[in-house]
Amino acid sequence: MFTTVVLQQVEAGELSLDDPLSTWFPDLPAADQVTIDMLLHHTSGYPHYTEIQSFLDRLWANPFQHWEIQDLVDIGVAGGPVFTPGTDWLFSDTNTLILQQVIEKVTGRSAGELLQEDIFDALGMDDSTAAFDANWPSPVLHGYSDERGVWEDVTNWSPTWTYTAGGVGADQEDVRVFLDALGDGSLLSPELHDQQFAPTTAGLGPWTDQQYWAMGFLQLDGWVFLNPGLSGYYGAGGTIPEEGWTMVVYTTPSQGGDQSAPTATDIFRQFTAVVTPEHSLEQ
């Protein structure tokens, strides 16, 4: 969702896809080489901060703590890019948080305000929140996890360790509404919609012309696909705009459950073989 917010600001003339990061944050590693486009496509080379052990140690020690976005960015960029920016692909939530900082700087508005006004309100998504706190509106699906060595309710863990990279809450119907708007381009100009969907990352990392990372989502054999996840939760959603198919799946782990049990993504893939065999994602 936040990628669309970024592109809306590009459309408004607040920034350009070719702008270097040094325009706003010259002290970040390789800031003169990394562009807004690279952050959106995950070709900056900045590591995925959620896979860095020092971050995980702090997170598991106190999952209720409030994180400052700059602390997370600092962890993610500490070692600099792992490849020359623009030459390879690596998914990294560090990119998303840097984009959040940029957008908040150029607009003078918080990411939560932008999501609420320009996405949720615009689409009538009344059961969505970007407050980035643990006070989820009721009723809320409870998530559980044993990642800290004990089975526990993780519903009220602080989502500030993700911000716009995963701290948005929405029910399945609101996710469907957003996916439909993402697919039909109703939130962007035709030009930016085309750029958002272009196979720019094809040939980088694992991506091809048929399966690639677009701006903010995966394009998989015709499916516009998202698979967000947090501790205690799995999500998968996708749409085929040309055919009018949209599916959203949420799952949570079960105590003592089979670790190989299907996740939301597994279930989604299985259903694609039933509803659209010609676009099946089942391996």
Question: Can you describe what each PLM-predicted range is?
Answer:
Residues 6, 178-179, 271:
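Hydrophobic "lid"/C-terminal helical patch
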Residues 32-231:
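Short, surface-exposed loop or secondary-structure junction motifs
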Residues 1-18, 99-104, 175, 244:
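Active-site SXXK
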Residues 236-257:
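Short, well-ordered beta-strand elements
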Residues 2-3, 36, 69, 268:
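A general structural signal for well-ordered alpha-helical segments in protein cores
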Residues 6-10, 25, 40-47:
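Generic hydrophobic/packing signal
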Residues 16-31:
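Short, glycine/proline-biased beta-turn/loop segments that scaffold the active-site neighborhood
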Residues 201, 210, 255-283:
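Short, gly/Ser/Thr-rich active-site loops of penicillin-recognizing serine hydrolases
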